[in-house]
Regions:
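Enzymes that bind and transform nitrogen-containing heteroaromatic metabolites
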Residues: 2-203
């Protein structure tokens, strides 16, 4: 007699990314090509809110981690996982609070199986986004569309806006997911226009 499999399904992954509308540029010389204060506040709220007040997880590549000013890392009130093929990152040890190192995205997700953490966010960079997009469990993208044609040297790997597998959700659904009011429509700051959006993979 065959015993039914009780293996838990892979956890849902949410990508959060800001990119240009023209070519989905996301980075320049190891950092963001812009600094938008409301976008930073939105990122913090989106990645910390959980309807059951659980601690969320943010997963990032080593270069993304190093682009965060040391005084702001690990990102507070979230469990940080930094990916490094070597399995180690300078300044992070087993005793480091709120942060750990995994050798790959799949390794990170294996570590999270059965944990009490909340939502899992993929926050960059390009290679990590690409690997996550290939996983069926990656089913949501919080996309900040920066409506400008700016110089970048790193682009988002897949234009999901033109992929029939993905659909843009309503603004009300975005607000429900992030747990509060979100500015609707374009925000203009420092001559840049940008908009908060949520996309989901079709079932």
């Amino acid at each position: 007699m065959t015993t039914p499999s009780t293996e838990m399904p892979p956890p849902s992954l949410t990508i959060i990314v800001a990119a240009t509308s023209s070519h989905l540029g996301i980075g320049l010389k190891g950092t963001l090509p812009w600094r938008l204060k409301p976008e930073i506040a939105y990122f913090k709220r989106a990645t910390t809110y959980h309807p059951e007040n659980r601690t969320n997880v943010v997963i990032m590549g080593r270069k993304c981690w190093e682009s965060i000013p040391p005084k702001f890392r690990p990102l507070p009130t979230r469990h940080n996982i930094v990916l490094s093929r070597k399995g180690k990152v300078e300044g992070i040890s087993e005793e480091s609070a709120g942060v750990e190192v995994a050798s790959s995205l799949r390794d990170a997700l294996t570590r999270l199986k059965g944990s009490e953490f909340g939502r899992i966010f993929i926050i960059g960079g390009g290679e990590v986004y690409q690997e996550a997009m290939q996983m069926a469990s990656c089913d949501r993208i919080l996309f900040t569309e920066v409506k400008a044609d700016m110089e970048t040297d790193v682009d988002y790997p897949i234009d999901f806006r033109r992929d029939q597998e993905w659909a843009r959700m309503s603004h009300e659904e975005l607000e429900a997911f992030v747990g509060g009011e979100v500015h609707k429509g374009d925000i203009i700051e420092d001559d840049l226009s940008y908009e908060f959006q949520m996309w989901e993979r079709k079932p």
